[in-house]
């Protein structure tokens, strides 16, 4: 096998301050092997060109500007221009620990794979809400271990905020598709179809900052639920009941509350109340387990307390997107999905 030469591909859109922190973290890597950085500006109005140029004496860095066509196409652009034989895909809102490159290099040298993913973590400098969001987005009780876990409830799917792709795999698949969000699992599904393997690299975590408010969090999770329906239609053999859980969780919870309110408003002890109380008790138990696991992982009582209601918000947002897309795609063939839900696809550049 040829020596691994990393090309770090970073799409960026109107976030020069973020790319500055990421590039700075790359200058502190303890890996002594050469690597290149490829930054692809996706049609930004607030570009990062000067910031990238300021690192030219510290990093082998190449900057490209292109019209806005989405993060997937930007990654493809970067990989097509990169000179490495292994691409490390990162989001611009990530910061790397100093051991990241050496950990990945050691893992690939020991057990090579054409595609890997790593965990995301919260840095101590993150805001309180960012830490809460990270806790909810990585807790196995709210994600099934799909994100940032070696052992989840489903086959590990690398995510593009922290993802490695060999040049061979990129050339075989053609890179990421037009769907967004969801371009990363869709890419992984096509890789699996071609016989390529994926793996989780323990220790190759990134600090994923997620510049996010409650409103943007709700919108993001809504989109995740929406595109999951599309992914299930395009790649049916990779469907998992796990991705139905937030929707079932939310629908049953709403039903329990409605039944309880009906009984209260009618001032009667309905025959179903015992089942309602049992159901609510199970939800309380689940919330306690989620709280305890978050407390154990984050080692913060405050984060654990706030994460519980945010978990309910996450499930409800996901469920709304999942149900809405499911209804809109009734009777729609796969060839017409993009026409029916165009907001989840980037257009080709003419």
Where are these regions (language model features)?
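A conserved acidic beta->alpha catalytic loop
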Residues: 25, 41-50, 68-69, 91-97
């Amino acid at each position: 096998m040829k020596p691994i030469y990393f090309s770090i591909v970073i799409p960026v859109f109107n976030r020069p301050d973020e790319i500055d922190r990421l590039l700075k973290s790359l200058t502190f890597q303890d890996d002594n092997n050469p690597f290149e950085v490829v930054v692809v500006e996706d049609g930004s109005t607030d570009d990062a060109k000067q910031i990238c140029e300021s690192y030219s004496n510290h990093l082998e860095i190449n900057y490209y500007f292109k019209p806005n066509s989405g993060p997937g196409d930007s990654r493809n652009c970067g990989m097509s221009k990169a000179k490495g034989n292994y691409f490390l895909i990162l989001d611009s809102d990530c910061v790397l620990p100093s051991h990241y490159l050496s950990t990945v290099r050691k893992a690939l040298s020991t057990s090579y794979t054409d595609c890997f993913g790593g965990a995301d973590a919260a840095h101590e400098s993150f805001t309180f809400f960012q830490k809460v969001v990270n806790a909810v987005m990585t807790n196995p009780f709210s994600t099934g271990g799909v994100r940032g876990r070696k052992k989840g409830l489903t086959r590990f799917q690398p995510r593009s905020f922290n993802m490695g792709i060999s040049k061979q795999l990129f050339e075989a698949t053609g890179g990421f598709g037009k769907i967004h969000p969801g371009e990363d699992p869709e890419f992984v599904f096509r890789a699996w179809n071609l016989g390529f393997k994926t793996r989780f690299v323990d220790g190759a975590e990134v600090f994923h900052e997620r510049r996010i408010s409650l409103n943007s969090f709700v919108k993001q999770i809504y989109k995740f639920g929406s595109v999951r329906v599309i992914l299930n239609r395009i790649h049916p053999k990779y469907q998992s009941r796990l991705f139905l859980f937030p929707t079932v969780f939310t629908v049953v919870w709403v039903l329990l509350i409605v039944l309880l309110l009906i009984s209260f408003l009618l001032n009667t002890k309905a025959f179903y109340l015992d089942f309602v109380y049992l159901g609510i008790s199970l939800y309380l138990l689940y919330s306690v387990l989620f709280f305890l696991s978050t407390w154990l992982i984050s080692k913060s009582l405050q984060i654990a307390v706030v994460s519980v209601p945010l978990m309910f918000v996450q499930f409800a947002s996901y469920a709304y997107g999942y149900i809405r897309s499911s209804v809109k795609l009734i009777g729609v063939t796969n060839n017409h999905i993009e026409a029916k839900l165009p907001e989840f696809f980037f257009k080709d550049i003419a």
